[in-house]
């Protein structure tokens, strides 16, 4: 595996992590707003 390919895969991995965290945060916020 070349360094470029490795960096590309890591960028995709962290991109997915960020998106997942963002979605989880939005879901939590929407649930909190509904409780109120």
Curated annotation (Swiss-Prot):
Protein's UniProt keywords contain Cell inner membrane: yes
Transmembrane regions: 9-29
Superkingdom of the organism of origin: Bacteria
The keyword rRNA processing belongs to this UniProt entry's keyword annotation: no
Membrane topology annotation: Single-pass membrane protein
GO cellular component: photosystem II; plasma membrane
Keywords from the UniProt entry: Cell inner membrane, Cell membrane, Membrane, Photosynthesis, Photosystem II, Transmembrane, Transmembrane helix
Subcellular location: Cell inner membrane
Stored InterPro entries: PSII_PsbX, PSII_PsbX_type_1_subfam
Biological processes per GO annotation: photosynthesis
Quaternary structure annotation from Swiss-Prot or TrEMBL: PSII is composed of 1 copy each of membrane proteins PsbA, PsbB, PsbC, PsbD, PsbE, PsbF, PsbH, PsbI, PsbJ, PsbK, PsbL, PsbM, PsbT, PsbX, Psb30/Ycf12, peripheral proteins PsbO, CyanoQ (PsbQ), PsbU, PsbV and a large number of cofactors. It forms dimeric complexes.
Role this protein plays: Involved in the binding and/or turnover of quinones at the Q(B) site of photosystem II (PSII). PSII is a light-driven water plastoquinone oxidoreductase, using light energy to abstract electrons from H(2)O, generating a proton gradient subsequently used for ATP formation.
Protein family: Belongs to the PsbX family. Type 1 subfamily.
Name of this protein: Photosystem II reaction center protein X
Protein's gene: psbX
